[in-house]
């Protein structure tokens, strides 16, 4: 895994979402070069995977708490 990829994994969820919005804006600009768009796409892909993983973790935790409450 590259250093950039490791740094992306440490990004808080809210910061990752904000960066995804920035990437979308950059990719929608007609002045963004093709190679730059590809790099942005790759970064966005990493950020989306991390966000999805964190959402799944939170959903699992919520389910666990809900199950514990209903057992009480």
From Swiss-Prot:
Q: Which Gene3D superfamilies is this protein grouped with?
A: Exonuclease VII, small subunit
**Where is this chain primarily localised?**
cytoplasm
- Top-level lineage group: Bacteria
Q: Name one GO biological process term.
A: DNA catabolic process
Molecular-function annotations in GO: exodeoxyribonuclease VII activity
Swiss-Prot/TrEMBL keywords: Cytoplasm, Exonuclease, Hydrolase, Nuclease
Task: Give, as one word, the top-level EC class.
Answer: hydrolase
Q: Which locations, inside or outside the cell, does it occupy? A: Cytoplasm
Gene Ontology CC: one annotated term: cytosol
Which reaction is catalysed here?
Exonucleolytic cleavage in either 5'- to 3'- or 3'- to 5'-direction to yield nucleoside 5'-phosphates
Assembly notes = Heterooligomer composed of large and small subunits.
General function of this protein: Bidirectionally degrades single-stranded DNA into large acid-insoluble oligonucleotides, which are then degraded further into small acid-soluble oligonucleotides.
NCBIfam families, sorted: PRK00977.1-4, xseB
Q: Which family is this protein grouped under?
A: Belongs to the XseB family.
Protein name (database record): Exodeoxyribonuclease 7 small subunit
Show the taxonomic lineage. Bacteria, Pseudomonadati, Chlamydiota, Chlamydiia, Chlamydiales
Identify the gene encoding this protein. xseB
